[in-house]
Swiss-Prot record:
Gene: rplC
Pfam families: Ribosomal_L3 (PF00297)
Annotated function: One of the primary rRNA binding proteins, it binds directly near the 3'-end of the 23S rRNA, where it nucleates assembly of the 50S subunit.
Name the UniProt record assigns to this protein: Large ribosomal subunit protein uL3
PANTHER family per the UniProt record, alphabetical: 50S RIBOSOMAL PROTEIN L3 (PTHR11229), LARGE RIBOSOMAL SUBUNIT PROTEIN UL3C (PTHR11229:SF16)
SUPFAM superfamilies (alphabetical): Translation proteins (SSF50447)
Gene Ontology terms, MF aspect: rRNA binding; structural constituent of ribosome
Region spans: Disordered: 126-149
Amino acid sequence: MTKGILGTKIGMTQIWKGDRAVPVTVVLAGPCPVVQRKTKLTDGYEAVQLGFAPKSEKRVNRPELGHFKKAGVAPMRFLREFRDFAPEGDTVNVDIFAEGEKIDATGTSKGKGTQGVMKRWNFAGGPASHGSKKWHRRPGSIGQRKTPGRVYKGKRMAGHMGMERVTVQNLEVVEVRADENLILVKGAIPGANGGLVMLRQAAKGGK
């Protein structure tokens, strides 16, 4: 059985463990009410739907409001499913994780707007000198000749960068502060401060 929780990225800091400083990301995680339980009998798979961050009923449409009332919980800003997770009780708190445990963190990366191929895809660019003129940051050739006579799908080119779902795997839980609903994770987590973060048990079972 896997486990997971929703939270908000607070920011990064460092704490001392013994005689060394450890960089950590602070996440305000939970409490997350259980909004729906899905079973193989009714839905074809096992999952639980968790909510996070209450919001006003005025901001909820009628179908959503009925969904929340059926579960007996206040309207939530975020709803996410966790497969093969069967929590005990009606609320999931940050204490489902323990210090030293490995987790996967999923967030939405920071938006960078429209960027060229050097920043977006780490292209080398053109020559800086020796006759090069207005070619320093260009991508170069993007195709072949009359055959195939088109640019292949997926060709790495300039365009919108960031604002994508990113998962960082096998991050270590440095500290859990259950009384404050805080979890301190070693290293960086994708996204801006205040963004939604999904924390799940490590899929690859990191050591």
